[in-house]
Amino acid sequence: FKDDIITGVDSNIRKIDVQDKVDQLNNVLVKMFGISTTSNKKGEISEQLVYNMINDKYPNYSYDVKRHIAHHADGELTSPTGMKCLVEIKNYTHTVNKDEINKFKDDLKTTNNNLGIFISLQTNISGRRLIDYETYDDTHIIYISKIMEDCNKLDCGILLLESIYKLIKK
């Protein structure tokens, strides 16, 4: 009877040990490959996705990653026409709030840029339609919500920015 108890306890300890190792391995795999572990990694992957979309559709455009520079949004898009705009990309599971919009507006002021495109991959942007436009203090912003539902929205946004650029440079 005593041996059965010892064998049972020993077996449970080994199972716990194995389960602990499985959990540790799982945590390592999630950290290495999972995008849900940190918003920074998730943001990086989202920005790369949009960068690839721009690069594929607009090979003559230049996209400079700025996410590592404070108050410079995620990137700056430059077209062959000379149009430059800041790019902000959000990959939230909830509606992008107004604080994020205000931060982007501050980034536009800081960089002295008067054109911007604010993109949400999966969700709505607070107070905005799926494709929307705002102007304030001679600054023009195109908002695109749920771009992953229809990647052609990016074309609309860039065409709008190019049209605005032509109007304001006159």
Give the label of every model feature segment.
Residues 1-111, 118-119:
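Extended, gly/pro-poor, charged amphipathic helical "stalk/hinge" elements that serve as dimerization
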Residues 114-115, 140:
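Proline-centered loop/turn at the N-terminus of a beta-strand
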Residues 122-170:
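Domain-level recognition of nuclease-like catalytic cores that cleave nucleotide substrates
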